[in-house]
Amino acid sequence: MSKTLYQKIYDSHVVYEDKNSTSILYIDLHLLHEVTSPQAFDSLRNKQRTVRQSKKTFATMDHNVSTKIQNISASGSMAQKQMEQLIQNCQEFNIPLYDINNPHQGIVHVIAPEKGMTLPGMTIVCGDSHTSTHGAFGALAFGIGTSEVEHVLATQTLKQKRFKNMKIEIIGKIPRFVTAKDIILFIIGKLGSSSGTGHVIEFCGDVIRNMSMEERMTICNMAIEMGAKSGLIAPDEITYSYLKNKIYSPSGLFWQKSLDYWKLLKSDHNAHYDKCFTVNISNLAPQITWGTNLDQVISIDEKIPDFNDVNSTIKKDSAKSACEYMGLKSNTYLTNISIDKVFIGSCTNARIEDLRSAAGILKNKKIAKHVQAIVVPGSGSVKRQAEREGLDKIFIDSGFEWRLPGCSMCLGMNKDRLNFGERCASXSNRNFEGRQGRGGRTH
């Protein structure tokens, strides 16, 4: 029987499956951070259980950390308590932790790939919705809730149902100044923010094959924004080259054995997909969201849509509500709108290639005096690499603040946030109401 990549990985990890296709899946890698794990550890203690496989579990601090000061007390008492609990829990259960004093600390979805923890064919979970990022390596990766975090800690397995298969083939030649972020935003705008609900999306096509691993991670990172369980890209030579000689990657004979297995990780030619789409990006322009959902997106040279042209009452009401919240009007250009802040960072766009691209645009330029702009590297390793290349100086000379690694302004869980009514051009993955701070407006 022909299988998709998703089906191959899923089937190879089934420990038990009942007649209703509900499975117990073995989990190869469990990633933790300070926000969604404390209750799970407390429940373990209450039930007198331990961590089943601490060597297949990894933790870091990222959501709450200060990007100004290397101190866990700098983000407030609640954040400090969560980080202290993570330290205690990792020590008690012998789980590796990259805390703020570790030179490699950073965003969990940046660290795991760059260190070679994320490998093709794995099942990977984390108490974070953007775990789909790791699907760029041909791994089945998805976010889980706190009760599921506890279950994986205790059993190294997870109860799951089978999802449908969706294929999105991306073709054409990428225009100048168009990035992977533009491509996935365009796809979300075209297909809708709920188009992937109940599915695992496999991205393929010549455009994907010519992308770097960092670009592929951006694509898969935002599969969740289509409502999908996860995103997947079959591994290839670009994947293998990226992984070779990473800290946690296989080496020696194990490297060759792993490579032999990874080369089998692709969908069969006549595998069945429940939905298939082909997207041509040859004429694509840079994309920007105007509303409070990811499918409320336009090209930078387009006007905000006329509500009278929206054929759905629900979508029309949503568009009106979004414009009211964002302080915008239909039939206007976003290029005429003043912004207050700029944020370059997050698990979507805080890797070295992202920083190189941004620095290339900013070189020998100055930002407007009224704008506060910050750039937050995705990890300590990314930060040091950028500094070796002199990118930090370009950012600082242009007027940006060069910060410490962390999730930062992607979400309002630390001191980096928007004030009420402030407008931000952000490289992060969500533009929801209040995402970057109460009353904040995110593009």
Swiss-Prot record:
* Cofactor binding, note field: Binds 1 [4Fe-4S] cluster per subunit.
Q: Which reaction does it catalyse?
A: (2R,3S)-3-isopropylmalate = (2S)-2-isopropylmalate
Which top-rank group of organisms is this from? Bacteria
Its pathway, per UniProt, is: Amino-acid biosynthesis; L-leucine biosynthesis; L-leucine from 3-methyl-2-oxobutanoate: step 2/4
Kindly state which keywords UniProt assigns to this record, in alphabetical order: 4Fe-4S, Amino-acid biosynthesis, Branched-chain amino acid biosynthesis, Iron, Iron-sulfur, Leucine biosynthesis, Lyase, Metal-binding, Plasmid
Assembly with partners or alone: Heterodimer of LeuC and LeuD.
What this protein is reported to do is described as:
Catalyzes the isomerization between 2-isopropylmalate and 3-isopropylmalate, via the formation of 2-isopropylmaleate.
What family does this belong to? Answer: Belongs to the aconitase/IPM isomerase family. LeuC type 1 subfamily.
UniProt KW Lyase keyword: yes
Q: What cofactor(s) does the depicted protein rely on? A: [4Fe-4S] cluster
Q: What is the taxonomic lineage of the source species?
A: Bacteria, Pseudomonadati, Pseudomonadota, Gammaproteobacteria, Enterobacterales
Quote the EC number: 4.2.1.33
Q: Report the record's Gene Ontology biological process terms.
A: L-leucine biosynthetic process
Q: What is this protein called?
A: 3-isopropylmalate dehydratase large subunit
Keyword Cell membrane included in the entry's annotation: no
GO MF annotations, alphabetized? 3-isopropylmalate dehydratase activity; 4 iron, 4 sulfur cluster binding; metal ion binding
Q: Which InterPro entries match?
A: 3-IsopropMal_deHydase_lsu, Acnase/IPM_dHydase_lsu_aba_1/3, Acoase/IPM_deHydtase_lsu_aba, Aconitase_4Fe-4S_BS, Aconitase_4Fe-4S_dom, IPM_dehydratase_rel_enz, IPMI_cat
> Where [4Fe-4S] cluster is bound, by residue?
347, 407, 410
User: Any transmembrane segments, and where?
Assistant: none
HAMAP family (UniProt xref) = LeuC_type1
